[in-house]
């Protein structure tokens, strides 16, 4: 058991009576990360566990059976975050976080980021500062709520990863989350516009089914 997991479990169990805890399981038709497919159009399973303290400190872990685009790719992703979030007023929130993404069978692909997020009314702005030469990422999204649904529009800009120009580009997505009987049904279209060459452009549709529980 690595040091982070020991620390996380210690914090999780020691502060549980003071915290809000939430776990989510999801089934996805593909894993899309910043406009790029991570699983070559194949389904993935994922689990997220999040803990929020009353003082605004927050932490969480996730695992996903993704990233097997080829036999040389890692076959699962495990990550964690530690941060702070603050509700300034009813219409303005911000959060700061340290995020670590790990691939147990391909540690060379591990990366860390610092993230800052502002949400105001139905808009959200996020900036991720890559550490150790990992590229930066920016994203703007808008959510429109109607009935038991969310219409979500997003735009993102991703710097190239090392010398891989195929990841250098912009991405757009439009989708709907529908909340039904405790489950969330998701459907969205994504488009990746590569700066290097139109041959690296990509688009597609993704479906998801998820269940979230607080405890």
Question: What would you call each of these model-derived segments?
Answer:
Residues 21-23, 55-61, 90-96, 121-126, ...:
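Repeated loop/turn-to-beta-strand initiation elements of outer-membrane beta-barrel proteins
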Residues 26-32, 62-66, 85, 97-103, ...:
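Outer-membrane beta-barrel pore domains and translocons
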Residues 41-45, 74-78, 108-114, 119-121, ...:
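Residues that define the transmembrane beta-barrel architecture of outer-membrane proteins
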Residues 19-67:
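Short glycine/proline- and aromatic-enriched beta-strand/turn motifs that initiate or cap beta-hairpins
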Residues 174, 178-183, 189-191, 200-215:
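Outer-membrane beta-barrel "beta-signal"
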Residues 54-89, 94-108:
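Surface-exposed loop and membrane-interface regions of Gram-negative outer-membrane beta-barrel proteins
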Residues 25-27, 47-53, 61, 80-84, ...:
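Residues on the lipid-exposed face of transmembrane beta-strands in outer-membrane beta-barrel proteins
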């Amino acid at each position: 058991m690595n040091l982070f997991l020991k620390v996380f479990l210690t914090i999780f169990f020691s502060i549980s009576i003071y915290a809000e805890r939430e776990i989510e399981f999801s089934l996805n038709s593909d894993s899309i990360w910043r406009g790029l497919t991570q699983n070559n159009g194949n389904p993935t399973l994922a689990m997220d566990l999040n803990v929020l303290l009353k003082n605004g400190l927050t932490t969480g872990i996730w695992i996903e059976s993704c990233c097997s685009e080829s036999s040389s790719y890692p076959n699962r992703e495990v990550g964690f975050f530690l941060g702070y979030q603050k509700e300034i007023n009813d219409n303005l929130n911000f959060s700061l976080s340290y995020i670590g993404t790990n691939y147990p069978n391909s540690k060379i692909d591990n990366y860390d980021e610092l993230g800052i997020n502002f949400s105001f009314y139905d808009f959200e702005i996020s900036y991720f500062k890559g550490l150790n030469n990992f590229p930066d990422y920016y994203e703007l999204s808008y959510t429109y709520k109607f009935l038991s649904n969310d219409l979500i529009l997003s735009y993102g800009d991703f710097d190239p990863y090392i010398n891989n120009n195929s990841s250098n580009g912009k991405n757009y997505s439009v989708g709907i989350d529908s909340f039904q009987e405790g489950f969330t049904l998701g459907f969205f279209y994504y488009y990746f516009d590569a700066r290097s060459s139109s041959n690296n452009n990509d688009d597609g549709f993704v479906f998801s089914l998820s269940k979230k529980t607080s405890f």
